[in-house]
Amino acid sequence: MILEVNKLRKEVSSGDSELTILDDVSFSLEEGQSLAITGPSGSGKSTLLGLLAGLDTATSGEIYLDEVSLHKLDEEDRATLRKEKVGFVFQSFELLPSLTALENVMLPSELKSEDNPRENAEYFLKRVG
């Protein structure tokens, strides 16, 4: 299991009241599977992505990335996990318009001086269609 989310809940405080952003979110993702998260603006998609990347913590529930509980990691270990295993491709307006789709996907690998950025980018673009 690459990703497993169990009963995830995220609440934020606003004055004297609590706002529930995510409630009882559960899913799992095996290697080679894809998952689309859709919904209107304000429905919690970005909050969910932040939790999955370890950028924020859930009110309750568990997230396992490669069978490692994000809840049990300190910030330094979450940062290492993000660096090694997590990446985002943002909506088109976040991409560099002067680069092709392939070049935009290659860019993070090139900035990190990784081997074979073109080959890796082509592989991932083929995986997502």
Question: Which residue stretches match the model-derived regions?
Answer:
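The feature captures the beta-strand-to-loop junction immediately N-terminal to the Walker
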Residues: 38-40
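Conserved ABC transporter NBD signature motif
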Residues: 61-69
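Short coil-to-helix segment of the ABC ATPase nucleotide-binding domain corresponding to the Q-loop/switch region
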Residues: 97-108
